[in-house]
Design a protein with these regions (language model features):
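Basic, Lys/Arg-rich alpha-helical nucleic-acid-recognition elements, primarily the DNA-binding modules
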Residues: 1-20
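Residue signature of alpha-solenoid helical repeat architecture, marking inter-repeat boundaries
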Residues: 49-56, 91-96, 135, 175-178
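Amphipathic alpha-helical segments of tetratricopeptide repeats
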Residues: 41-45, 81-88, 121-128, 162-173, ...
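C-terminal non-catalytic interaction modules
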Residues: 189-233
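Helix-turn-helix repeat elements of alpha-solenoid scaffolds
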Residues: 28-42, 70-81, 110-122, 154-164, ...
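Residue at a conserved register position within TPR or TPR-like alpha-solenoid repeats
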Residues: 104, 141, 148, 191-193
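Helix-turn-helix/homeodomain-like alpha-helical modules used for DNA recognition
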Residues: 15-70, 79-80
Length: 233
């Protein structure tokens, strides 16, 4: 048994308990009596007591769920710093670490992403080979692309988007329909933001997207593209 195989089986035992705790916390986020700052404080206290990074990751999930403002997000710089320092110290990434990178690439410094980009992709591919978890690499790339777009860093967004499309190119197209659609969508979004193409040229694409993903998903994605492209049109 390899270390990676042992790690995967161990995670199958530990993860359900943690997933349940996360689900219960995210359910409580919707309650009027929920106090996010108290929850953050409690989770930090648990982290200092157990040294389990999971409690800091809970805070990231909670903040993402509540859609706090950028000012409020500054309150979580502690979590971002501790998590990045932890990932810089360990020699390899397991499933837990890769899930953090996939879900929250935007919490890391540019230097960390640039220095570890190839390592992250390589480890995610290894994980996919071990237990067919293909979604880690795609989620990481699409979230990183989205983050760069939202911050106006379109050259970086295009570079990651092209990387995403290359990673899908060798796969059977029928097995990655959603992934291919989203990679194409972000390619078009970047082009629109750069003023390279007009949004009216995308109607055929959105018709296909609606057919595959439904009207609600089409409306949401089309609205996002129009909002980003509007200043350049």
């Amino acid at each position: 048994m390899t270390l990676a195989e042992y790690e995967w089986m161990r995670n199958q035992l530990d993860e359900p308990i943690k997933l349940k705790k996360k689900r219960l916390m995210l359910d409580r986020v919707q309650e009027d009596s929920f106090d996010p700052y108290k929850e953050i404080s409690n989770n930090r206290r648990h982290f200092k007591k157990t040294e389990d990074l999971y409690y800091l990751v809970l805070n990231l999930h909670m903040v993402e769920k509540t859609e706090v403002s950028e000012t409020e997000f500054e309150f979580l710089r502690y979590e971002c710093r501790i998590i990045e320092e932890y990932l810089m110290q360990i020699p390899d990434y397991g499933q837990f670490e890769l899930s953090i990178l996939a879900d929250f690439p935007w919490i890391f410094s540019d230097r960390f992403i640039e220095n570890n980009y190839l390592k992250i992709k390589k480890r995610m591919r290894r994980l996919a080979q071990l237990n067919n978890h293909e979604q880690y690499l795609f989620t990481f790339l699409i979230n990183l692309t989205s983050f760069y777009i939202e911050n106006g860093r379109l050259k970086k967004a295009r570079s990651v988007n092209e990387d995403m499309k290359r990673s899908l190119a060798h796969k059977e197209r029928s097995t990655v329909i959603y992934e291919t659609l989203m990679a194409d969508y972000y390619q078009r979004l970047i082009s629109a933001a750069l003023g390279e193409e007009k949004t009216k040229d995308y109607q055929e694409f959105f018709t296909v997207l609606e057919y595959m993903l439904g009207k609600n998903q089409r409306r949401s994605l089309e609205k996002k593209l129009l909002a980003i492209a509007e200043p350049s049109n």
